[in-house]
Amino acid sequence: MHPFSRLFRNIQSLGEEEVQELLGPPEDALPLLAGEDLNHRVADALNLHLPTADLQWVHKTNAITGLYSNQAAQFNPHWIQPEFPELHLHNELIKKLQQYFGPLTINEKRKLQLNFPARFFPKATKYFPLIKGIKNNYPNFALEHFFATANYLWTLWEAGILYLRKNQTTLTFKGKPYSWEHRQLVQHNGQQHKSHLQSRQNSSVVACSGHLLHNHLPSEPVSVSTRNLSNNIFGKSQNSTRTGLCSHKQIQTDRLEHLARISCRSKTTIGQQGSSPKISSNFRNQTWAYNSSWNSGHTTWFSSASNSNKSRSREKAYSSNSTSKRYSPPLNYEKSDFSSPGVRGRIKRLDNNGTPTQCLWRSFYDTKPCGSYCIHHIVSSIDDWGPCTVTGDVTIKSPRTPRRITGGVFLVDKNPNNSSESRLVVDFSQFSRGHTRVHWPKFAVPNLQTLANLLSTDLQWLSLDVSAAFYHIPISPAAVPHLLVGSPGLERFNTCLSYSTHNRNDSQLQTMHNLCTRHVYSSLLLLFKTYGRKLHLLAHPFIMGFRKLPMGVGLSPFLLAQFTSALASMVRRNFPHCVVFAYMDDLVLGARTSEHLTAIYTHICSVFLDLGIHLNVNKTKWWGNHLHFMGYVITSSGVLPQDKHVKKLSRYLRSVPVNQPLDYKICERLTDILNYVAPFTLCGYAALMPLYHAIASRTAFVFSSLYKSWLLSLYEELWPVVRQRGVVCSVFADATPTGWGIATTCQLLSGTFAFPLPIATAELIAACLARCWTGARLLGTDNSVVLSGKLTSFPWLLACVANWILRGTSFCYVPSALNPADLPSRGLLPVLRPLPRLRFRPPTSRISLWAASPPVSPRRPVRVAWSSPVQNCEPWIPP
């Protein structure tokens, strides 16, 4: 049935004779459909012209939103965070693959070397402050989203997917180190690496004296008077520390020895002796610097000891009064219980600059509750909140990593059909725009015709899903400074609190109570039920870098496609009688019998598990002869969209209002849905050309009742996209602005147009006539526009009818000099000659879905327990 038969009869401006002529023979109707006057008259009847600007646009139609009506993201307080297995590829992946699959090809090695490890070194990187680490996409659930996102990041760190930044040059992580990480190894399983330990022993005494003195100190306590220490090292007078008989080097060495003995001595002794508030703050800074660094496994004596020269140069600039105003812990801190550090008291820790900072969470211990909703009630309910930070199994050296981030993070639903689980979104969009833009490598994506050519066969199908596929591919540690994420800590919710203020006294604690509101208090109580003591760890700021491939970088899809395609190629070579197809994290297996498919699946699962590749068993599906893949149903008869997409499209299209101007954003979102099913309709994409014109013009579009009903009738009747076959071309078509010609193996045909036409339009009409009169599914032509198959550049009515006529037709290029239809198109009928032998090969869009393999040797041992379905030594190759 003609696609315009019902539409033309409903247009009153078209007479009955004109309708019969338009629906008549194609040689008469097609030139008329290309006429500009007819297209304008039909557009007027369907009200397809752009509306005037004085009409008010509609910005929302049921489920489709347009301009100024963006839907707010929905936060789920009961999101389930996924659990990640130990994702660690084998250290010798290429050698291990060669043991299983034999020698690898050059392309397979190249693809694997790109991913092991992956490298990402942009020319420019923009760094953002840590306060932008977690995006506030849910203002009504800011605190809940903050802790949920921080917990997600710590979950990734525990799975070995993220590095934790300890300082500018040190990273720590959990899991097994890769071979390239062994070169930068500092600490592994609590033990110093040999190379790092040797370099530390060869360094200066200042850099490592604290660690060495601690190892060589006697076990019995040594009584050292605090008074003597303060008089001998620092002194109550500034001049006494500067004008001694001993040299500066001796003073520095004595200072280090005394401080090391104090840190190794019983803390109860120091607590009993106490300390005066008038003691120089420099002594307390160095003591706390050593204790904090010793707990974290590092020494920071060098930074504190090297400042003696700076303090000596500032002796004349600062008086004794100004010196006493330097940073010193408050009185409550000095009177805290030293016998149980890390449990109560305003515990100090070092930031990355070596400056002691206080734990915001534990600081509520020493403050009086400001009201009934004070956080003091929550903090004081537990004595031991655990450590402020953690250290992984492995510590490595890294390039200079600033205390900044390169992208924010937030949580969303895992997918539109699963709102119970959360997914982490990393915003590394700076590498896709601006001066920091990176031009990502391109890779081929299978189109609809490619899927039909390669997968539309009568096989048994099985689809596999790689669990957390992006997180399988490791990244070089040198790329960490470009892929930084983090959390600003609770200070994000109290902007008045500043850790860099010079007036550090108890008045600062009053600003902390700005957090004490009813909403924060009730939210923390609910979060405590979820996270327990981990709430304290999540409240601290931290910076992490990606150790595995993140999903927010444009390089990730390219690398993942290379990785999975290399695996599919190796499996295909070893199982030449099956079909293996990989796209991103989806792997498809096809075999002639279900028993053979089961054997291949068992072997692949065991091999992948040994290589460290985890498959999601819950998403493994056996499809039989109907493969569901990428939203399509692929069978031996062709490809059709899944029912859920058809129902969604019909629901959205029926909800579109009639005779109301819809803004172009609604048209964009509607065409996104219609384009998915358009290749299966009679008129294809050409039916949506009026919508494309409105979107390109950035103006509104009005659906008439005739146009809407016509679209509904088109999308109710779907036709499969069938597989193309490799045959020899036997029909050729050519045209001139005034005539057309067709050449077959047995005859030559020619004709003329009633009026001159553009050459591309004439070539398209000639191809349509050749298809109608010969029924050939393969045509030879010399016009590149017709070869492309993109008909949206032609007049609207002609494009729709041509798409209907040429549906399922393939084209092959023939030069004009060799085209046998060239002379008939010019009105000449020469003697019939043999046609050029042109063989058509179905295109695969540069997708290597299968690898050519040698024939199966008859002496090769069988891979399955029963007889192989291969009846001969020839490998089965997709058509």
Swiss-Prot record:
- Mind listing the UniProt keywords for this protein, alphabetically? DNA replication, DNA-binding, DNA-directed DNA polymerase, Endonuclease, Host-virus interaction, Hydrolase, Inhibition of host innate immune response by virus, Inhibition of host RLR pathway by virus, Magnesium, Metal-binding, Multifunctional enzyme, Nuclease, Nucleotidyltransferase, RNA-directed DNA polymerase, Transferase, Viral immunoevasion
Q: Name one GO molecular function term.
A: RNA-directed DNA polymerase activity
Q: Where is this region: Polymerase/reverse transcriptase domain (RT)?
A: 383-724
Recorded hits in InterPro entries, A to Z, give:
DNA/RNA_pol_sf (IPR043502), DNApol_viral_C (IPR001462), DNApol_viral_N (IPR000201), HBV_DPOL (IPR037531), Hepadnavirus_pol/RT (IPR052055), Rev_trsase/Diguanyl_cyclase (IPR043128), RT_dom (IPR000477)
Annotated positions for site Priming of reverse-transcription by covalently linking the first nucleotide of the (-)DNA: Y68
List the residue ranges of the region (Disordered): 304-345
Catalyzed reaction equations: DNA(n) + a 2'-deoxyribonucleoside 5'-triphosphate = DNA(n+1) + diphosphate; Endonucleolytic cleavage to 5'-phosphomonoester
**The Reverse transcriptase domain covers which part of the protein?**
393-634
Instruction: List every stretch annotated Spacer.
Output: 185-382
Q: GO BP, one example?
A: DNA replication
Ribonucleoprotein in keyword set: no
Tell me, what's a Pfam family for it? RVT_1
The reply on keyword Nucleotidyltransferase is: yes
Gene3D superfamilies hit by this protein? 3.30.70.270
Q: Where is this region: Terminal protein domain (TP)?
A: 1-184
- The UniProt annotation places Mg(2+) binding at D465, D585, D586
Activity regulation info: Activated by host HSP70 and HSP40 in vitro to be able to bind the epsilon loop of the pgRNA. Because deletion of the RNase H region renders the protein partly chaperone-independent, the chaperones may be needed indirectly to relieve occlusion of the RNA-binding site by this domain. Inhibited by several reverse-transcriptase inhibitors: Lamivudine, Adefovir and Entecavir.
Q: Give the EC number(s) under which this enzyme is classified.
A: 2.7.7.7, 2.7.7.49, 3.1.26.4
The job of this chain, per UniProt, is described as: Multifunctional enzyme that converts the viral RNA genome into dsDNA in viral cytoplasmic capsids. This enzyme displays a DNA polymerase activity that can copy either DNA or RNA templates, and a ribonuclease H (RNase H) activity that cleaves the RNA strand of RNA-DNA heteroduplexes in a partially processive 3'- to 5'-endonucleasic mode. Neo-synthesized pregenomic RNA (pgRNA) are encapsidated together with the P protein, and reverse-transcribed inside the nucleocapsid.
About its domains, the entry says: Terminal protein domain (TP) is hepadnavirus-specific. Spacer domain is highly variable and separates the TP and RT domains. Polymerase/reverse-transcriptase domain (RT) and ribonuclease H domain (RH) are similar to retrovirus reverse transcriptase/RNase H. The polymerase/reverse transcriptase (RT) and ribonuclease H (RH) domains are structured in five subdomains: finger, palm, thumb, connection and RNase H. Within the palm subdomain, the 'primer grip' region is thought to be involved in the positioning of the primer terminus for accommodating the incoming nucleotide. The RH domain stabilizes the association of RT with primer-template.
Similarity annotation? Belongs to the hepadnaviridae P protein family.
**Which protein are we looking at?**
Protein P
Give me the gene this protein comes from.
P
